[in-house]
């Protein structure tokens, strides 16, 4: 107060330029999100075209071995296409909830291999796990190989079987994926660390790419058969 009078001070600042910049940044970010979404959509469509070409190739041969190879390649492509489809459908364009992906991919593979001779029961124990696309695709390919191998070989000598998938996070730092079956088990002469089959070689290479670890052992839950259990420990970042 000065001689009994109150004095007020006001500062005016022109922020119109800052607002213009903020709006431009917001518009630019929205445009980039749309472009990224479109990229995932186009990648998915291109992969589906490749898958369709494999289907046409398969229709041109009656050789069972060639058909099997074509179908294996087709499944690998479809597993990658499904990743891009899930991201395209999601609000988060940088990550995918692998929990939903596991169930969808396994079900898709199961339906393609299903025969009347074998009654395989699928079971899932899946936690929500967010993965960036550069980790989701290798994990998807690993899942594809193990599911396909189990459906092709594990139950060849039995009419019923169980295939179980467990997905969880440990210490908020690593993904743990377990794929197990109660089938005949992997023969003793086949060592995972040196197996020459393309599927198991892919699993080894992809696990190393992710800086992960894999353990292969007899399924301890089996009572009448050896079974197989793969356990993967993969860093989330």
Which stretches of residues belong to each language-model region?
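Short loop/turn elements at sensory-signaling interfaces that couple input to output
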Residues: 1-8
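Sensory-domain boundary capping and coupling elements
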Residues: 10-12, 84
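PAS-associated C-terminal cap
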Residues: 13-27
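Histidine phosphotransfer helical core of two-component systems
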Residues: 27, 32-34, 42, 47-96
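Conserved short strand/loop->alpha-helix "switch" segment adjacent to the catalytic nucleotide/phosphoryl-transfer site
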Residues: 30-36, 40, 62, 94-96, ...
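Glycine-rich/acidic phosphate-handling loop/turn and adjacent ATP-lid/helix
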Residues: 174-200
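Glycine-rich ATP-binding loops of the HATPase_c
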Residues: 211-222
């Amino acid at each position: 107060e000065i001689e009994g009078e109150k004095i007020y001070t006001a500062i005016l600042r022109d922020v119109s330029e800052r607002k213009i910049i903020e709006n431009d940044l917001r518009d630019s970010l929205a445009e980039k999100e749309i472009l990224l979404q479109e990229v995932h959509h186009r990648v998915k469509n291109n992969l589906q075209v490749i898958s369709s070409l494999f289907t046409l190739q398969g229709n041109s041969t009656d050789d069972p071995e060639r058909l099997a190879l074509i179908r294996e390649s087709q499944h690998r492509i479809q597993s990658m296409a499904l990743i891009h489809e899930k991201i395209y459908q999601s609000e988060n364009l940088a990550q995918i909830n692998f929990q939903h992906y596991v169930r969808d991919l396994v079900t898709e593979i199961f339906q393609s291999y299903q025969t009347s001779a074998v009654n395989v029961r699928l079971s899932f124990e899946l936690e929500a796990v967010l993965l960036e696309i550069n980790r989701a695709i290798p994990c998807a390919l690993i899942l594809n190989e193990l599911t396909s191998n189990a459906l092709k070989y594990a139950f060849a000598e039995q009419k019923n079987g169980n295939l179980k998938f467990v997905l969880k996070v440990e210490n908020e730092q690593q993904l743990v994926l377990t794929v197990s079956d109660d089938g005949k088990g992997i023969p003793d002469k086949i060592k995972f660390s040196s197996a020459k089959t393309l599927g198991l070689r892919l699993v080894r290479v992809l696990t190393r790419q992710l800086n992960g670890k894999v353990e292969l052992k007899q399924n301890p839950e089996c009572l009448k058969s050896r079974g197989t259990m793969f356990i993967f420990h993969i860093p989330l970042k």
